[in-house]
Regions:
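RNase H-like nuclease fold core
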Residues: 1-52, 56, 60-67, 71, ...
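RNase H catalytic domain
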Residues: 13-20, 59-140, 144, 149
């Protein structure tokens, strides 16, 4: 039996944050460490923030995965907010009625809730990568997200 895994590299871009934004996700499926399928996804928004684009990239990438997928899925992002939210802060936010420790509401609650929902039943690992540091997969989605943001009229 082949060992299957899925990687999702994501990035968001925002010109004049807040402002025009773009997102990108590269979804790759591997069988025994050989890439067997790849999908590049991207989109844009006329008025948004970099955090919303980072989250949208992950949401759209995960949205390509079937709900009954058994493979290990690793999401790579250079967004410390996204990785920290998904690996550390979410349980407290949910327990505190979507409020931060400061008492202020969690921003982008709609996207956090959508990310929780899309991950349900999946084996998802969240991994931070340093942006603009020579990681070829991160550079790929960074360029696509920037191009998508630049296309917004």
């Amino acid at each position: 039996m082949k060992h299957t895994k899925i990687t999702i590299h994501t990035d968001g871009s925002c010109l004049n944050n807040p402002g025009r934004g773009g997102w990108a996700a590269a979804v790759r499926r591997y069988a025994d460490d050989e890439e067997v399928k790849k999908a590049l996804l991207s989109g844009h928004a006329p008025a948004t923030t970099n955090n919303r684009m980072e989250m949208t990239a992950a949401l759209r990438g995960l949205g390509k995965i079937k709900r009954n997928e058994q493979a290990q899925i690793t999401v790579y992002s250079d967004s410390q907010l996204l990785i920290g939210g998904m690996t550390e802060w979410l349980p407290n936010w949910q327990r505190n009625a979507w409020r931060k420790s400061s008492g202020k509401p969690v921003e982008n609650r709609d996207l956090w809730e959508a990310l929780v929902a899309v991950c349900e039943g999946l084996d998802v690992k969240w991994t931070w990568v340093r942006g603009h540091n020579g990681d070829a997969r991160n550079e790929e989605v960074d360029a696509i997200a920037f191009a998508a943001a630049s296309k917004v009229a």
